[in-house]
From Swiss-Prot:
Full protein name: Virion infectivity factor
Sorted UniProt keywords: Host cytoplasm, Virion
Location in or out of the cell: Host cytoplasm; Virion
Record's function text: Determines virus infectivity.
């Protein structure tokens, strides 16, 4: 990298800390030949910040894979469904709750949803990546001080079919108390992940008793329209996770 390129990159990074809008203003003021290069660098930095933020939240919740999106205008409940429409296929239901509903109740990571499986992702009414290191949205499983009602929304509900999930043990299977084939392959995999130790023969045996998870591909036709977008905002789960990932996943 030349000295000149390094100066541009350093300035861009400094502006990025001030927010997306400032960074885009800075890029638009550059000569046309430099704009494309800076846009690519800018998008890469946004992606890294988003990915790191999402990874930390998913790790705290034990979510191995998930759908996520951001919307600047969160004014009402929106539902998005990703997955195949075929019977017995895995579907992903995402409900974005209205932040105004949290005037008196703001759920935290430890108390917002008792039903499993679930997916959750924090959504704020600003840019998720603006000065993200100092936002300190969540601490100890609860929303941090300074985030008032209406400032944080939450994506609720599960990626799975409508079959009820229960707590399972190998003993229940051996005694014939439950029939693993009553659940689709995806549901059985999720329950095995939840209630069996990772990297054990016990988990492999439980998974082998159920149906094979069918291949599926997401086909979400809806998009959240907003002028404040990056390519990362359109990320959708496209393919079913591989079985080896499910086998070794730790919740």
């Amino acid at each position: 990298m030349s000295d000149e390129d390094w100066q541009v990159s350093r300035r861009l990074f400094a502006v990025l800390q001030g927010g997306v809008y400032s960074a885009m203003l800075y890029i638009s003021s550059l000569p046309e030949m430099e704009q494309d290069k800076c846009k690519r660098s800018f998008k890469k930095r946004l992606s890294e910040k988003e990915t790191g933020f999402i990874f930390r939240l998913r790790k705290a919740e034990g979510i191995r894979w998930s759908f996520h999106t951001r919307d600047y205008y969160i004014g009402y409940v929106r539902e998005m469904v990703a997955g195949s429409s075929l019977p017995d296929s895995l579907r992903l239901y995402v409900y974005i709750s209205n932040p105004l509903w949290h005037q008196s109740y703001r759920p935290g990571l430890t108390n917002f949803n008792t039903e499993w499986p679930f997916v959750n992702m924090w959504i704020k009414t600003g840019f998720m990546w603006d000065d993200i290191e100092s936002q300190n949205i969540c601490k100890g499983g609860e929303i941090s001080h300074g985030w008032g009602p209406g400032m944080v929304g939450i994506v609720i509900k599960a990626f799975s079919c409508g079959e009820r999930k229960i707590k399972i043990t190998p003993v229940m299977i051996i005694r014939g108390e439950i029939d693993p084939t009553e659940w689709c392959g995806d549901c059985w995999n999720l329950m095995c992940l939840k209630y069996s130790p990772p990297n054990t023969l016990q988990r492999l045996a439980m998974l082998a008793c159920g149906k094979e998870a069918k291949e599926w591909r997401g086909c979400c036709n809806q998009r959240f329209v907003s002028p404040f977008r990056t390519p990362c905002d359109l990320e959708v789960v496209q393919n079913k996770p591989k079985r080896n990932l499910l086998w070794t996943g730790e919740l």
